């Protein structure tokens, strides 16, 4: 889409509005698999670390997780507005309209997508919504959208362990003590293996073209933190920024496509079983045809899209492995394969 130039957001109630520039909004389709992945890239400069953490935590949520006693939506942006090139509002979030969300869950047994994301998906419309449209979609993955974040810091070595944990696990900001420190979001025992599980520290060193560069990956999110003063780190043509936007983006996209496809095949099988009436010969015949079709489709997916290595480069290979392991792709593939066959 080319009509969206920016997004104006209020991270938490009482925060000042801020405007993020929109780099691009794309919808990715895949051959022979009925999946689409939405890709939205936004950018901003000179943000405090706490603001960046809150934006990462709140931005990509398809709908609110709940509401507080005052009716304020929880864990998502307090307000979001898509803007055109003239600054006019194209669509705004409706997260605080609690009754509308609960009404759809009550009547359709399916969540309601927030208005600003619903607008972004047009001309596709939600399958459970009342909007007319031939092209319809259903949410198949978690309501917290997968995200990537590129952070150029003034002094990345000054970040505390708590800062990295909050960035890597996307937990939002925490209260600062008088010395400027911040408590860990989870217990120390739970985070004992954080560095070995979630950090890729090959370039976390004072030397090299992009010194003090650390990658963090938990499957749901991939984050890179580096030195803003490094020319190579900030280079959008050949440096870390270019690699992150193109090469590492594809690594992350492939991993989440594989997960979404496996979830889709599992969902289709469940729908097929739900519609089976063993006392009706026509229903049994339809069931057999659907099972054969599903098996053939899964076989094509396995041969065309299922692989464990996506690059020869050691860094990309390692990042893809981290994504796959945290998403549990091998176990999910084995489970779906057993059910389909």
Regions found by a protein language model. Give the residues of each.
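Membrane-associated alpha-helical segments
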Residues: 244-341
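Short beta-strand segments that buttress and anchor functional surface loops
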Residues: 6-12
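Long, charged/polar, low-complexity intrinsically disordered N-terminal extensions
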Residues: 1-4
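Extended alpha-helical interaction modules
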Residues: 12-277
């Amino acid at each position: 889409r080319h009509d969206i130039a920016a997004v104006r957001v209020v991270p938490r109630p009482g925060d000042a509005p801020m405007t993020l520039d929109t780099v691009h909004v794309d919808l990715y389709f895949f051959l022979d698999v009925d999946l689409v992945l939405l890709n939205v890239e936004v950018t901003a400069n000179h943000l405090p670390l706490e603001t960046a953490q809150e934006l990462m935590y709140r931005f990509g949520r398809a709908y609110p997780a709940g509401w507080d006693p005052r009716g304020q939506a929880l864990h998502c942006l307090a307000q979001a507005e898509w803007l055109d090139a003239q600054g006019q509002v194209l669509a705004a979030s409706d997260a605080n309209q609690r009754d509308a969300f609960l009404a759809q869950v009550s009547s359709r047994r399916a969540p309601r997508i927030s208005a600003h994301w619903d607008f972004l998906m047009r001309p596709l419309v939600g399958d459970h919504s009342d909007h007319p449209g031939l092209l319809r979609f259903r949410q198949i993955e978690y309501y917290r959208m997968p995200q990537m974040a590129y952070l150029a810091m003034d002094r990345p070595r000054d970040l505390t362990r708590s800062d990295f944990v909050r960035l890597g696990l996307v937990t939002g900001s925490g209260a600062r003590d008088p010395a400027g420190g911040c408590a860990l979001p989870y217990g120390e025992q739970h985070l004992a293996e954080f560095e070995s599980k979630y950090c890729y520290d090959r370039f976390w060193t004072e030397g090299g073209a992009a010194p003090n560069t650390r990658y963090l990956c938990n499957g749901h999110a991939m984050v890179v933190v580096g030195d803003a003063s490094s020319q190579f780190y900030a280079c959008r043509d050949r440096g870390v920024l270019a690699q992150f936007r193109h090469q590492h983006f594809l690594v992350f996209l492939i991993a989440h496509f594989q997960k979404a496809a496996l979830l889709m095949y599992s969902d289709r099988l469940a729908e097929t079983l739900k519609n089976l009436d063993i006392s009706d010969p026509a229903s049994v015949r339809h069931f057999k045809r659907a099972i054969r079709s599903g098996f053939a489709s899964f076989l094509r997916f396995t041969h065309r899209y299922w692989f464990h290595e996506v690059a020869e480069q050691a860094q990309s290979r390692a990042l893809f492995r981290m994504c796959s392991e945290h998403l549990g792709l091998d176990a999910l593939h084995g489970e779906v394969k057993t059910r389909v066959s």
